[in-house]
Amino acid sequence: MAVTKLVLVRHGESQWNKENRFTGWYDVDLSEKGVSEAKAAGKLLKEEGYSFDFAYTSVLKRAIHTLWNVLDELDQAWLPVEKSWKLNERHYGALQGLNKAETAEKYGDEQVKQWRRGFAVTPPELTKDDERYPGHDPRYAKLSEKELPLTESLALTIDRVIPYWNETILPRMKSGERVIIAAHGNSLRALVKYLDNMSEEEILELNIPTGVPLMYEFDENFKPLKRYYLGNADEIAAKAAAVANQGKAK
């Protein structure tokens, strides 16, 4: 049976991950640790014999720079890359820039967990005159006002990620090309929920660690056979637990 593999990588730790702030569409860069995580992911993929034909990422530099570092370690800096806003992190609305633990102290752990992980729950909206509104950013100049979020739930994130998967990424994989996607915690959770047919309750508890290759294997009909991380299982579990704890009051 022919098996097709897909590699997903959540960007390495960003400066705002380090500061425990809601990031969303804010274009913050990787921390030093994040750069190291991305390089380590590339080294691990190289050790396991991976190489690629095409890469996808978002239009946010923490994902773009993660991909750069991964491909550099693979000696594939030349690889063709498509950047799409549809792979961006979920938009966190008026929470963007706020400290997660301080927000939990103000609103409670459960409310913040719902804002972070609830399927259909949206954080408080931005207003269009807010400097954080993506309509002020030239990289989104060609998007319609309807496409520009004031806030997003995971459900709304799925509404942009999955059509892009089905219409753009999957056809390339079906043509036989080997694909890597460098994206974000929630855009990748959106894809995992879809591929694994997860319930809303199951996806609530899924936390994807930064800078760790997440592997999928598909059968000849492109149905997922298995999903697993590359790397030390104990270290990965600890990183995932740390992601879960970010939204709790100190």
From Swiss-Prot:
It catalyses: (2R)-2-phosphoglycerate = (2R)-3-phosphoglycerate. The active site is at H11, E89. Substrate binds at residues 10-17, 23-24, 62, 89-92, 100, 116-117, 185-186. One of its GO terms (molecular function) is phosphoglycerate mutase activity. Homodimer. NCBIfam families: pgm_1, PRK14115.1. This is 2,3-bisphosphoglycerate-dependent phosphoglycerate mutase.
